[in-house]
Design a protein with these regions (language model features):
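Conserved oxyanion/phosphate-binding beta-strand-loop segments in alpha/beta enzyme cores
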Residues: 1-34
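Gly/Thr-rich phosphate-binding loop signature of adenosyl cofactor/nucleotide-binding cores
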Residues: 76
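A conserved hydrophobic secondary-structure block that centers on an alpha-helix together
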Residues: 23-71, 144-168
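ATP-dependent phospho-/nucleotidyl transfer catalytic cores
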Residues: 80-178
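A short glycine-rich, hydrophobically flanked beta-strand micro-motif that places a catalytic Asp/Glu
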Residues: 56-62, 186-193
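Short, solvent-exposed loop/turn and secondary-structure capping segments
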Residues: 25, 73, 85-89, 185-191, ...
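Sec-exported extracytoplasmic/periplasmic mature domains
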Residues: 48-53, 174-180
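C-terminal catalytic region of ATP-dependent kinase domains
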Residues: 159, 180-181, 193-236
Length: 236
């Protein structure tokens, strides 16, 4: 989106080769802190981790690019094995809903005309780091189990407590509301960790874009937003 390239601080996506890590991360983004509302995102994600909810790591760094000082950048972890380990969870898969129908089939200027309930129910499950997952029999089995949970949620064919880890999900949604960080709940942005011990999903904090305005434009708990009916399902 335009906020990642319109200014003087363009966003960068970094993937380390081999076993290389930077600050313990193998995959991360570097971007203007304004993109995630400056320190608000850092505070929100740290609050999640303090309450044992999953989130990506987020910190600020002084970036030098090809010898040029670029100033302070936000370093935002992307989904990886290291991210799971940093959250003190056992290795598992991270799944989400494919956003093809949203961005490829319907241009952004058509979004106001979309029937969001149909888009949500029609979106296909997807997995992060597919190559690594498919190289492991155990992770592949987890992937298909997690996919089945996502499909059950789309069809509302079971109880929310059978899909989500109730304590972590409840705290996650409560903190999201307290921080006005509902942007991260958008069905095309939310990612879930499949916990192989409980066989349930846990939401991952990412791109919440929290605001101090109590009437945040993403406040689904106040006026509802049908495109994010996974939230309505989880709140059951």
């Amino acid at each position: 989106l335009a906020d990642h390239w319109s200014g003087g601080k363009w966003s960068l996506r970094v993937e380390m080769k081999g076993d290389g890590l930077v600050k313990g991360m193998s995959r991360f983004s570097l971007q203007d802190p304004v993109t995630r509302n400056n320190t608000a995102e850092w505070l929100f994600l740290n609050n999640l981790r303090k309450e044992n909810c999953m989130s990506v790591r987020y910190r600020f760094v002084n970036l030098v690019l090809n010898g040029k000082a670029m100033g302070i950048y936000a370093m935002e972890e992307h989904f990886s094995k290291e991210m799971i380990e940093a959250n003190q969870r056992r290795e598992g898969v991270i799944v989400n809903y494919d956003d093809y129908l949203l961005w490829k089939k319907f241009p952004e200027d058509m979004h106001s005309n979309i029937e969001w309930n149909s888009i949500f129910r029609s979106s296909l499950p997807d997995v992060r780091n597919n190559k690594r997952v498919n190289g492991s029999t155990d992770l592949t089995r987890q992937k298909y189990h997690a996919f089945s949970l996502l499909r059950l949620m789309q069809k509302s064919q079971c109880l929310a407590s059978e899909i989500f880890s109730s304590e972590e999900t409840g705290k996650f949604l409560a903190l999201t509301r307290l921080w006005s960080a509902e942007k991260g709940l958008f069905y095309a942005d939310i990612n879930f960790y499949f916990n192989p011990i409980t066989s349930k999903l846990e939401p991952i904090g990412f791109d919440g874009n929290p605001t101090r305005n109590s009437k945040a434009p993403y406040c689904y708990f106040t006026w509802g937003d049908i495109k994010d009916n996974w939230v309505n399902f989880a709140l059951q």
